[in-house]
């Protein structure tokens, strides 16, 4: 860790997210045929492939991680250290440490809009084929989430052909595992999305299967959801699928951004290759 408590090396990825304004962390959750789920130490089929196919969008620059992202961005650019404003907390004693959780209408609006646009490119929820965008928050408690939901409703009014629904993050975590087939596109705030998407990776076989994209209006970069997996160091074990899936996402983004049909075909070919490999290989 750095002297200020931030994770060493975080300036690279975190700095890019904030510095390039990559406001949407897009994480597809798709279960391929042939992939088992490790539960109680054993591999078995828990969820059915045709019932797990959603995309979760996590706000990527605001919320509980805003201060960390801003510090990382400033450090990467050689700018002065960002410090959060001083705040008094009545009735708290001893050492008090806090991380603000700012949520803006602007940041929420562009995230939600991307979610609705992505829904137009998909086949709807596995359960019923309905194009649906789900707003996941904690608006019964926090004011930031109340703004998030109000902004969601405002954006949703521009997409009358796309269904909407809502959930509180605590309830969503159980629905995610009990009825994943209900979900098509999900939008949520930064920390909620960070936690929920790691949980959702279990549906697709684990973190080693999960790719992601950090996407803004003009720039993007793509990475596996997982970290460096030091527990496997020296064991000659590797699962490249999350990296390959991230490359597939990159090609799809480039193809759509540039209107390049050839690149889009490459993206489809990568997805088909992964699907074929997993179907014909032992889990």
What are these regions (language model features)?
Residues 92-167:
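Glycine-rich phosphate/diphosphate-binding loop of Rossmann-like nucleotide-binding domains
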Residues 175-269, 273-277:
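Glycine-rich phosphate/nucleotide-binding loop
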């Amino acid at each position: 860790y750095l002297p200020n408590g931030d994770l060493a090396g975080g300036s690279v990825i975190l700095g890019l997210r904030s510095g390039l304004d990559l406001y949407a962390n897009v994480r597809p959750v798709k279960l391929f045929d042939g992939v088992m789920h490790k539960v109680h130490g054993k591999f078995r089929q828990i969820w059915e492939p045709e019932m797990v196919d959603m995309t979760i969008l996590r706000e990527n620059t605001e919320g509980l991680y805003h201060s960390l992202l801003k510090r990382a961005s400033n450090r990467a650019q050689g700018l002065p250290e960002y410090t959060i404003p001083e705040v008094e907390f009545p009735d708290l004693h001893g050492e008090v440490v806090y991380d603000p959780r700012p949520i803006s209408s602007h940041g929420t609006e562009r995230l939600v809009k991307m979610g609705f646009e992505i829904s137009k490119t998909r086949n709807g929820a596995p359960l019923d084929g309905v194009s649906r965008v789900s707003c996941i928050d904690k608006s019964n408690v926090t004011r930031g989430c109340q703004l998030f939901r109000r902004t969601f409703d405002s954006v949703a009014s521009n997409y009358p052909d796309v269904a909407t629904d809502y959930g509180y993050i605590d309830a969503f975590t159980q629905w995610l595992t009990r009825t994943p087939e209900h979900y098509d596109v999900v939008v949520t705030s930064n920390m909620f999305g960070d936690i929920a998407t790691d949980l959702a990776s279990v549906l697709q076989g684990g973190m080693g299967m999960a790719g992601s994209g950090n996407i803004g209006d003009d720039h993007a970069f793509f990475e596996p959801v997982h970290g460096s997996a030091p527990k496997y160091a020296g064991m000659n074990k590797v699962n490249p699928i999350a990296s390959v899936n991230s490359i597939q996402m990159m090609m799809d983004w480039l193809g759509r951004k540039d209107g390049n049909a050839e690149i889009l075909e490459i993206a489809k070919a990568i997805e088909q290759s992964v699907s074929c490999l997993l179907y014909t290989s032992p889990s």
